[in-house]
UniProtKB/Swiss-Prot annotation:
First-listed, main subcellular location of the protein, grouped into a coarse class: cytoplasm
Enzyme class, spelled out: transferase
Subcellular location: Cytoplasm
Keyword Amino-acid biosynthesis: yes
Keyword Lipid biosynthesis in annotation: no
Native species: Wolbachia sp. subsp. Brugia malayi (strain TRS)
Binding residue positions for substrate: R106, D143
GO cellular component labels: cytoplasm
Pfam family, one: Hexapep_2
Record's keyword terms, sorted: Acyltransferase, Amino-acid biosynthesis, Cytoplasm, Diaminopimelate biosynthesis, Lysine biosynthesis, Repeat, Transferase
Cystine connections: none
Name of this chain's protein: 2,3,4,5-tetrahydropyridine-2,6-dicarboxylate N-succinyltransferase
Name of the gene this protein is made from: dapD
Length: 273
């Protein structure tokens, strides 16, 4: 019931956001928006969630709250062995050693997580960037120089390799975030953007780029997918010919994940201890 009230308040603030120039209106809105940010930060709510039938739903009101966070906060000096000037704090501001032990998060020097992003237990964060509203599920590693965009959803026991870009989406506000389901391996320097869903157990090879309009071709069946990689697919970069014989980039499903693939891409539990 309380969450429904918060949702209703956020939607009302969003409709009347032009009034936020009024200080008292802005002050009242800030109290509500900070409640949403706190719920996001703790993982009690998330921008997108998977239903029992495998479909994902996007909670637009939460995305609206994140956008309103930028409207209701003032930029301030932020000291982290160097100065920044931003509206959003680091998630780990004020944390002590005990809090890190309790959360079972390993945050390597150079990682930066903005407040409102959720990070689950046994997650390893190498020097990387996690943007607002993102959700990183338990047992996942975000490797060096990877960027997780706003509201992106990363599943359990995933490995997001070095230099990977996972697209964010706060504009346009109704667009769906990128979703990486459980037990996926995203190869180095790959890019997934524009609301694409990588289904459970899939493996993307190094340098695979997938957006909403990217052709994803199953080599065995010649079936073409857009915006979604089927479960347990092994995907590599490739090319296909257009109607006028011009070579166009595509992603190719070369096979389904087998035991050999699992051995090559399995996560190392020692690194998460």
């Amino acid at each position: 019931m309380q969450l429904e009230k918060i949702q209703s308040d956020v939607e009302d603030i969003w409709k009347n956001r032009s009034k936020l120039s009024n200080r008292s209106v802005k002050r009242a809105a800030r109290v509500i928006i900070k409640k949403v940010i706190k719920l996001l930060d703790s993982g009690k709510i998330r921008v997108a969630e998977r239903l029992s039938d495998g479909k994902w739903i996007v909670h637009t009101w939460i995305k609206q709250a994140i956008s309103l966070y930028f409207l209701t906060e003032e930029s301030k000096m932020i000291d982290h062995t160097g100065w920044w000037f931003d509206k959003v704090n680091n998630k780990f501001d004020g944390w002590n050693e005990e809090e890190f032990h309790q959360s079972k998060i390993r945050a390597v020097p150079g990682c930066f997580v903005r407040q409102s992003a959720y990070v689950g237990t046994n997650v390893v964060l190498m020097p990387s960037f996690i943007n607002v509203g993102a959700y990183i599920s338990s047992g996942t590693m975000i490797d060096t120089w990877s960027t997780i965009g706003s509201c992106a959803q990363i599943g359990k026991n995933c490995h997001v390799s070095g230099g990977v870009g996972i697209g964010g989406v706060l504009e346009p506000i109704q667009a769906s975030p990128v979703i990486i389901e459980d037990n996926c391996f995203i190869g180095a320097r790959s890019e997934v953007a524009e609301g694409v869903i990588i289904r459970e157990g899939s493996v993307l090879g190094m340098g695979v780029f997938i957006g909403a309009s990217t052709k994803i071709i199953d080599r065995e069946t010649n079936k073409v997918f857009y915006g979604e990689v089927p479960p347990y697919s092994v995907v590599v970069p490739g090319s296909t010919l257009s109607a006028n014989n011009i070579s166009i980039y595509c992603a190719i499903i070369v096979k389904k994940v087998d035991e050999k693939t699992r051995q090559k891409t399995s996560i190392n539990e020692i690194l998460r201890d």
